[in-house]
Amino acid sequence: MGDMTNSDFYSKNQRNESSHGGEFGCTMEELRSLMELRGTEAVVKIKETYGDTEAICRRLKTSPVEGLPGTAPDLEKRKQIFGQNFIPPKKPKTFLQLVWEALQDVTLIILEIAAIISLGLSFYHPPGESNEGCATAQGGAEDEGEAEAGWIEGAAILLSVICVVLVTAFNDWSKEKQFRGLQSRIEQEQKFTVVRAGQVVQIPVAEIVVGDIAQIKYGDLLPADGLFIQGNDLKIDESSLTGESDQVRKSVDKDPMLLSGTHVMEGSGRMVVTAVGVNSQTGIIFTLLGAGGEEEEKKDKKAKQQDGAAAMEMQPLKSAEGGDADDKKKANMHKKEKSVLQGKLTKLAVQIGKAGLVMSAITVIILVLYFTVDTFVVNKKPWLTECTPVYVQYFVKFFIIGVTVLVVAVPEGLPLAVTISLAYSVKKMMKDNNLVRHLDACETMGNATAICSDKTGTLTTNRMTVVQAYVGDVHYKEIPDPSSINAKTLELLVNAIAINSAYTTKILPPEKEGALPRQVGNKTECGLLGFVLDLRQDYEPVRSQMPEEKLYKVYTFNSVRKSMSTVIKMPDESFRMYSKGASEIVLKKCCKILSGAGEARVFRPRDRDEMVKKVIEPMACDGLRTICVAYRDFPSSPEPDWDNENDILNELTCICVVGIEDPVRPEVPEAIRKCQRAGITVRMVTGDNINTARAIAIKCGIIHPGEDFLCLEGKEFNRRIRNEKGEIEQERIDKIWPKLRVLARSSPTDKHTLVKGIIDSTHTEQRQVVAVTGDGTNDGPALKKADVGFAMGIAGTDVAKEASDIILTDDNFSSIVKAVMWGRNVYDSISKFLQFQLTVNVVAVIVAFTGACITQDSPLKAVQMLWVNLIMDTFASLALATEPPTETLLLRKPYGRNKPLISRTMMKNILGHAVYQLTLIFTLLFVGEKMFQIDSGRNAPLHSPPSEHYTIIFNTFVMMQLFNEINARKIHGERNVFDGIFRNPIFCTIVLGTFAIQIVIVQFGGKPFSCSPLQLDQWMWCIFIGLGELVWGQVIATIPTSRLKFLKEAGRLTQKEEIPEEELNEDVEEIDHAERELRRGQILWFRGLNRIQTQIRVVKAFRSSLYEGLEKPESRTSIHNFMAHPEFRIEDSQPHIPLIDDTDLEEDAALKQNSSPPSSLNKNNSAIDSGINLTTDTSKSATSSSPGSPIHSLETSL
């Protein structure tokens, strides 16, 4: 979003503002400058200028309690004056830009040049008849008409190049379009709670306006700037803006400034929105960033790395989230290393590219030598000046043949297949309730070997209901009759639950008749409020009598306290505190308990032990969560020191203990069975009591009675994995994790430790690939560390969603199984395409190479090769990459990180089919004219008309590919290749479409396609030979792979994948280096793989900037979304520097970059050079941001 957009945006707002000056008591500019202040400075400014926050509310014509009236004209006016809460997106790339990018492909450029030379030479006629003497070297002289047709081949090559470019550009364009749709879907998902006309409503983040009263709570990501009005115990993590890792406590009198993009780590409250969109603190930075990024991009045109631009725009805004930048870098590394598939593919493409280059170079050399020796040595012809153009034409023809071999050798369709497959899967996964945020997560899921799942809400329905209670010395196995409970106890119980729950938690009547009441807010609290209603009491009157503003002090729930307490002032000025929390934790703090008569009696430790045995354990063994409700009274004077938590949260009086049931989702046991069958271990990590957790794990089928497994509590787990010094040891973790199935009473740190322990373990031969689910703010680290992080779409906090790779829109475990299926399907789709593509490549290269060497001419012409290779492969990648997944995918074990891309079975298929195709093509080439009684096409003069002979070879070749495409649908040696073929209409359409186009090319292609129309019987033979592919496929399937020990596998990532990631850094960068080299165009054939680059770039750009980058339009429609990504954190070795306007720094950076050595376009023009470069450069370019690169300079400048 360039300077232009911003200046328009601002100037428009300023103009409006001056005209509306009198509408509100403060202008946008004033509010904007107010929000730039911090702490006491801000408090002083508010006091001096406005009086207090309430006065600001009055000026903004809003009420701190009722909120805005919410009428359309009022909202519209606010949007006009103060701006809207989104950031103007960057313009998408136009179709023409994409065409221009596709044209940058070096193989295409070489072909264009060759075609133009060929065109030019065909129009140039040397004088005199000596022309005839020149050409005799090669199968006789050409006649006048043939020479005239010389330009056709050149023109045809140019045309097919244009065709290829358009197909590529269209593919990229449609992908961008699709991801934009996905992006807007993510945007609509984001809602925030505001108060309008006294009602609490959820509205999309983009709808928030200045003056709105927003309700904020634990786990929120603030969508706009605002001032704190009231709340309890609110702590904010502002590291995303300031780089300070300490949490900041907010209060009206000390620090009321709340900034967009920061995280609520604890507490709750209300704020009045004062700045939105580009005027909020995040928006201002974002604006600077956008402008800076655009300038950089202009300067960076040379390096042709569109991806780099996205990366650059993202780099500056990182922060050391946990203080330690190194850890963060490691985490980023880990994410990079994640796309195992991308790494394997890049490596494979590079290897194939090398081979292709060598083959094409040899072809050209042999042709040139043969021609010169034959003409000037054997036939002893002098080099005549007038013959030069003819000789040059021969050389150009040889050159075109060489380039053709290269074109065929390079598997352009490969990255395209990945992109299509991922894009297709992501779109379909939305229907299966998986919202994919990082593309490669989809493919990583196919390799998952372990899933660490939360219990609440994922394995269970998260609809809490109290089913047992212990009140007044009696253990009730169902909801007690209210008349059997002492009236005083009952009143205390109702007050304790109604007041000491978030006021946003409510139970509403059902939407449809006969449905269950709706639970809104925290589900455990909903269960307790439901208990109050079941006791035929009502919590609303209690709350209206004691509104939220009147609460004296609140200790919010967090993972350390494991309880929540609220203090209120009684009518006699004394204080009462209500507490609730996990029973074993709260009971330890109780010294009294209410008896049946409602009197408090002493509660000794031995009473507590008895209660645990007789009440809590039986409840837990039924799979219930136990919650204890208690209270404590304090005298009015001296007022207690409320900050001294240890003294306050003690000496409580227990009112009751309830057992809450959270039933297992009916579909979960089946889903877990599928996982286990698919070789995936499911572990449950929960904060619940160990007995509850074990009971639920048995119900889900995670553990089966009588098996050898471990169920540990967090404390015990920590004791076992740490040495005497309290340090975690990997060997100790290795002893535990293989048997561990349930980790109970665990903290988020335990979860992170477990995930890291499993991922770093070298205990098993395959390194583990771990998926994790999380919903809480503090699950962030574990979600980031995991190979795939799943966040809950319904119950998850914004912080968890931001750290995740996939969002489960229905919070359901069975959706994870669908993700596994899709992931494996991506892997299979790519293997299918590889199998098909490599057969085409092997055959075409060998045919062109041997044909050229033996007959001086490639049996498959340049234009035909382009049709086969580029168009057909592009279509084939579409056909094979869109196969829908089936349940059978879940019947085999995960591939793991080291499984080669091309298995032995696939290698058998590739070579087997190549043998069949080569045998037939060479038979046709050397004896075809006798079989069909036609003229031989071998040794034809330079511009001779197309021969039937070579047309038959071309046609047979294409028919064999078509039928082999059907064979390629199965890669595990299955017999029935037609299985489920009609479930994939795209496949059928493409096969039939390709066949139809082939008929048109052969019958009407004429000179441009070097085709001569064929008779019906010749067509029949071609199709018959093609059909033979299917029969031959069955023959190959009969040969047992185990016998073919000599077959090598390919596309394997080296053993480095097995090393824990600390030592991986350089290695990871190597994979990445390959991808980066692809983008830099540093080596001739690397640039020759430029079309691969386009696709990889698209995958990578989407992977990195689908939701994180400014690269995609709308990708930041809401400012909320902008800060929601780790990419926008100032990450640097000196994290604690507030962000400064870095436009000049960025210019420096660009200058530095311009002077840096890799201005590759002119350096490596000779292929041999590039080969040497490859070996010497690796170490240099392997560092992720070499000192000259713009990203590095940006990092250092910040």
From Swiss-Prot:
Name by which UniProt lists this protein: Plasma membrane calcium-transporting ATPase 2
Low complexity bias: start-end ranges: 1151-1166, 1175-1189
Residue ranges, compositional bias (Basic and acidic residues): 296-305
Composition bias, Polar residues: 1-13
Phenotype of null mutants: Mutant mice, born at the expected Mendelian rate, show balance impairment and hearing loss. They develop severe ataxia before 2 weeks of age associated with the absence of otoconia in the vestibular inner ear.
InterPro entries listed in its UniProt record: ATP_Ca_trans_C, ATPase_P-typ_cation-transptr_C, ATPase_P-typ_cation-transptr_N, ATPase_P-typ_cyto_dom_N, ATPase_P-typ_P_site, ATPase_P-typ_TM_dom_sf, ATPase_P-typ_transduc_dom_A_sf, HAD-like_sf
Record-listed Mg(2+) binding positions: 775, 779
TM segment ranges: 95-115, 153-173, 346-365, 399-416, 831-850, 861-881, 902-924, 943-964, 984-1005, 1016-1037
A matching Pfam family: E1-E2_ATPase
Gene name tied to this protein: Atp2b2
Region (Calmodulin-binding subdomain A): 1078-1095
Entry superkingdom: Eukaryota
